[in-house]
Amino acid sequence: MDAEHFPVGFFRWDQRPAPVVAAAAAPTTTVFNKDHGRPLEVILPMNGRKDLKSLEDLFKEYGVRYVTLAKMTEMGFTANTLVNMTEEEIEDLMKTLVELYHMDLLIGERYGIKSAIRAEKKRLQDSLEMQRLEILSEAERKRILHDDQNTFAAAMASEGTSKELRANDPLIFPESTSADHAPMNIASCKDSTLILQNSNQAQFCGSGLIGVPEHSSESDERKADTNKQKRRRSKEPGEDGEDRPREHPFIVTEPGELARGKKNGLDYLFDLYEQCGKFLLEVQRIAKEKGEKCPTKVTNQVFRHAKHNGAVYINKPKMRHYVHCYALHCLDSEQSNHLRRLYKERGENVGAWRQACYYPLVAIARENNWDIEGIFNRNEKLKIWYVPTKLRQLCHMERSKECQ
């Protein structure tokens, strides 16, 4: 090919000094001359060198020659342009280089261009995902801290209120009666109900009794209609013809505690994972008898086998949703039990407890050189489960912070 079509900066072996007039018009850079031991001024294009440097970074270690990079820069392509192009557009670019500019693209260069662009896209997507997870984790920490502060403030307020009531209201606490505190006139409050039915509508009367506004029959009927509409809406099928997704029927319970009502406890949840391990053994036995490939982890085949055997309460979304909670239960039962007791005392729902189970696992991964995959594979009960994607991403994010 004719070398006159390329910027002079690519031909670093060219030892000819640049003209003085051209050097005054264009920015220069210094290249060391090995033969004469003195610096040599080489002219660089005004707007091509910056783009070229970006292309060098993009295609570094992917086997793309400088001649190809120079021609792509001359055509006006930058690293950002290439990263935002589709596979078809990349094919058109390489076809143009071959047919229109008569360049001999090597096979490795073709795959190198595609691989470099694909890797850069994946890196950008991973970076955005890490930022999103970092924002979510920070928001979760702030929410937990805010809940702790609210709980402490509510406890202090309730303690102060109870002391004030005990001192000032002999009608409620007869043991504190004295001559200075005569029984109050109940009629002074608009409503003398002492039972709190709605904390948002509760008001304190002058002497400490809690007055709750009286609910009219119209408001009761309106609330009843609203509840009926909610129940009717929950029973209606979704837009796609399937049932609407419902919350998993679990509540936070302490170890050994039996759940009451319609929802199950966490011991029942962990027992489901034990049952999945037994169903996996049955699937492996059947596969060996048929001479088929045996699954080593809990896959869709295991869930179908469980459903076929009547275990309809075992399904893939539920088991994948809480697998990291089961991992913490297997790896550090003391920490798992502590979290269960803590969130049970706070009255938190199972969703908040589930989010809190991530952080002890990240700490365990830090102690094991961030080998979360190996931690799962070395445990007899966890090696049949896949590592959750979010747990893997959190470990990667924390590891990146330590490296920085």
UniProtKB/Swiss-Prot annotation:
One of its GO terms (biological process) is regulation of DNA-templated transcription. It is found in: Nucleus. InterPro entries: FLO/LFY_C, FLO_LFY, Floricaula/leafy_C_sf, LFY_SAM. Pfam families: C_LFY_FLO, SAM_LFY. One of its GO terms (cellular component) is nucleus. One of its GO terms (molecular function) is DNA binding. It comes from the Eukaryota. This is Floricaula/leafy-like protein FL1. It comes from Pinus radiata.
